[in-house]
A protein has these predicted regions:
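Predominantly a Rossmann-like dinucleotide-binding segment in NAD(P)-dependent oxidoreductases
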Residues: 126-213, 332
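Hydrophobic residues in well-ordered beta-strands that form the structural core
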Residues: 56, 72, 94-95, 120-122, ...
């Protein structure tokens, strides 16, 4: 029997627990080695549930457990330090999006992985969700011609965690919610984003007790791609009707719509799962297959010593687009993504 790839999951919140369950139960070539969680009560609960030890920091785990790779599912402002430490210890790294807060951090993480000779993969789940994969394949096959216009949206039903309310600790909702969109439109169009113009609004923050400056719960970004294509990204969090993720690509010869679940031309949706058509109640339900697929891809890539499907350059590109969009709405002007080359 081939040895299984041993994984330490860092962060036992919603995403971390999902990755831990998948590593433990859904990927035959992998096994869960341990949980790393700063809150010992949370870490021990997940560890006990899955039958593995829990540690309160990565240094303890490196000293006390054997593993081949890590999954980083902690707040964004901790990603760089953890990734550099793990890579320096010779561990392969799967990092949840957003990759980091700044491009300098992205570069540090990428360099650490390169110098250590380990795989570094970023968790852009849509690249592994079957309907998105099929859309990419059809676009590459030329079924709709050359992409001209792309529209992508993500709406989440709950408030982000408190640390994500603060722009300087998270880069805001455009990072926490819409990083997926920035990556997805690059991937589907096959082109880098050249210029962005963003507008934001705050409709629900005050009534839900959010006091952080520069907080917003709605955003729209218009895009121009290097290829000449145009696009829009929008995000809302919280969107009380449920979790929603869709993309539309208009080409010179046709249209692809991914994630549409509407049976009527006029539709009203209010409560999660109780409207005129069913809605997804959470991101984990919407992308269940994708989360299994991305972790399986990481394991396969690490075992083979291959190039990851979604690497550090992809994570960096999304961070650059997010930061340019934040500069755009803060300064009220279009911003070239290349101007964020160092920040």
């Amino acid at each position: 029997l081939k040895p299984r790839f041993r994984i330490a999951v860092i962060g036992a919140g919603r995403a971390g627990r999902l990755h831990a369950v998948n590593a433990s139960q859904s990927i035959s070539s992998a096994e869960l080695s341990c949980i790393v969680e700063a809150d010992p009560e949370v870490g021990n609960k997940v560890g006990d549930e899955l039958g593995v030890p829990a540690f309160t920091d990565l240094e303890q785990a490196l000293a006390g457990a054997a593993f081949d790779g890590v999954v980083i599912a902690t707040p964004t402002f901790t990603h760089a330090q953890l990734a550099v430490l793990a890579a320096g210890a010779g561990k392969h790294v799967f990092c949840e999006k957003p990759m980091a807060l700044t491009l300098d951090e992205c570069d540090e993480m990428s360099l650490a992985a390169d110098e250590a000779g380990v795989v570094f993969e970023v968790g852009f789940v849509r690249r592994f969700q079957p309907e998105f994969v099929e859309a990419k394949s059809r676009i590459e096959a030329g079924e709709i011609g050359r992409p001209m216009l792309v529209k992508s949206l993500t709406r989440g039903p709950g408030l982000p965690p408190p640390w994500a309310h603060e722009l300087h600790r998270s880069n805001g909702m455009l990072a926490e919610v819409n990083s997926h969109d920035f990556d997805c439109v690059r991937w589907l169009t096959g082109s880098e984003i050249e210029r962005v113009f963003a507008e934001t609004a705050n409709f629900k923050g005050a009534e839900r007790g959010v006091t952080a400056p520069d907080y917003y719960d709605n955003a729209v970004v218009t895009l121009r791609f290097v290829s000449g294509a145009l696009g829009t990204i929008d995000g809302t969090c919280p969107a009380d009707y449920g979790y929603d993720a869709r993309v539309e690509v208009l080409g010179t010869e046709g249209l692809l719509v991914v994630g549409q679940n509407q049976a009527t031309s006029l539709l009203k949706i209010r409560a999660r799962g109780a409207g005129e058509v069913p809605t997804y109640v959470s991101w984990s339900q919407r992308f269940e297959a994708g989360y299994r697929g991305e972790l399986a891809s990481f394991v396969k890539t690490a075992l083979a010593g291959a190039v990851p499907e979604v690497g550090a350059a992809d994570g960096r590109a999304a961070v650059a687009a997010v930061r340019a969009s934040n500069r755009s709405w803060l300064e009220g002007r279009p911003v070239l993504v290349a101007s964020e080359s160092v920040a």
